[in-house]
Design a protein with these regions (language model features):
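Bacterial N-terminal signal peptides
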Residues: 2-12
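Non-globular targeting/processing and membrane-anchoring segments
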Residues: 19-147, 224, 228-230, 235-385
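Short, solvent-exposed linear motifs at loop/edge-of-secondary-structure regions
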Residues: 1-3, 166-184
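Short, thiol/selenol-centered motifs that function as redox-active sites or metal-ligating centers
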Residues: 96-107, 148-175
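Active-site/pore-lining binding-face segments in mid-to-C-terminal subdomains
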Residues: 176-263
Length: 385
């Protein structure tokens, strides 16, 4: 009886239990204030205010560029194209660090999944950085995020630089994208996928138990991290800043290799299939969706998406046509800029753009082509007569 009473009292008092998911919202708010400069609240006592102020002044200039050259024109562009009644679930393969673009492309989204080789990262370090460490970490972060906020995609090199240290790349980039679009964090949790694709959120005791198991690179030609494998995958819940009644948006970043050997039949594939019909996007994806070794993620998209925005690294034209999709092109595409891209699909893409009227594209969306032209395509079901 006494144990039952104690349990009820503990529940009523809001005391966290050992098996409850650990919420790192306090750490997320530190990132929101110190790294992405989402508000002007005092910084944590251990951090140098002047260093943060200087960083935030530089960030504001990057945000101004982001909105002027990308968020504003792209938002208007997509608003005129998106059909009514699209799913509010977004899947963004090869979407490392690019939550901001997902919100630009799909502003009505409520569930967003980005997938890349990079791990989410440890959220607990930044609040304890010494002045010199903080200055260096913020400088490295700005150097990396600058490409995203000025060129609107994240390079592999920039992602790799932040796979270790006090300000991990995926966590910081996604919170920055959220901040750039006017949102604030509500919850931050970490998880793994069970064999059936369901989500298992880590409790504090599980995170403690994994503290000495360092996350390893997912692909051989990548880099190892210096943080626990508990921080591989993140779930960031957020809403419009200053509006407690605004709808919640859930973003999950999952560290996974999308090559067939790792994806087909995997917990990730099952997790994605459980979502039902989705909208999709990809850009700056190294032309991997063209590749025979990525047939699983390509087929998943063809079977489950109802609308997709991409640069030319999206679905190959012949595969799209066979699955009943029509592709509408914008800008100019004269060929992939990476020599290792599939040449047959590259030629098909050139033919696709050449076969359609030239439609203006007022912003960069992913890679430029081999001649530095911006381009974009929409893959959508063919209209039924």
């Amino acid at each position: 009886m006494l144990l039952a009473v104690a349990f009820v009292l503990a529940a009523a008092s809001g005391v966290a239990h050992a098996d409850e998911p650990k919420d790192f919202i306090d750490d997320a708010r530190v990132f929101y204030r110190v790294v992405s400069c989402g508000n002007t609240a005092p910084v944590p006592a251990d951090l140098d205010q002047a260093t943060v102020d200087k960083h935030c002044a530089a960030m504001q200039k990057l945000y101004d560029t982001w909105h002027k050259t990308y968020a504003e024109p792209a938002s208007k562009f997509f608003a005129a194209l998106r059909p009514q009644g699209l799913p509010t679930t977004v899947v963004y393969p090869f979407g490392g660090g690019d939550l901001g673009s997902a919100l630009v492309t799909y502003p009505d989204a409520r569930d967003i999944t980005t997938i890349s080789l990079e791990h989410a990262g440890d959220p607990t370090r930044v609040a304890h950085l010494k002045k010199a460490q903080l200055r260096e970490a913020l400088s490295n972060f700005r150097a990396a995020i600058g490409g995203l906020l000025t060129l609107h995609d994240s390079t592999t090199e920039n992602m790799l630089k932040l796979e270790s240290g006090g300000i991990p790349g995926q966590l910081s980039f996604h919170i920055t994208g959220m901040t750039a679009m006017g949102y604030e964090p509500v919850s931050l949790k970490f998880f793994k996928l069970e064999d059936d694709g369901s989500i298992h959120y880590y409790s504090q005791s599980e995170i403690d138990a994994l503290a000495h198991r360092t996350a390893k690179k997912i692909k051989s030609k990548w880099v190892d991290t210096d943080f626990s494998e508990a921080f591989n995958n993140m779930e960031l819940t957020f809403r419009k800043a200053g509006d407690p009644k605004a709808p919640l948006i859930v973003h999950r970043h999952i560290a996974w290799n999308l090559a067939d050997k790792a994806f087909k039949g995997s917990p990730l594939e099952k997790y994605l299939l459980a979502k039902g019909k989705v909208v999709a996007m990809t850009k700056a994806a190294s032309y991997l969706i063209w590749d025979w070794g990525f047939s699983g993620i390509r087929q998943y998209l063809l079977d489950n998406m109802v609308w997709m925005a991409s640069d030319a690294t999206g679905i190959p034209p012949k595969a799209a046509k066979k699955a009943g999709f029509k592709q509408t092109t914008y800008g100019t595409f004269t060929g992939p800029f990476l020599e290792e891209a599939n040449k047959t699909v590259g030629a098909d893409m050139v033919e696709l753009w050449a076969s359609q009227p030239k439609r203006r594209l007022p912003f960069r969306y992913g890679y430029p082509d081999m001649d530095k032209h911006v381009h974009l395509m929409i893959t959508a079901p063919k209209e039924t007569k």
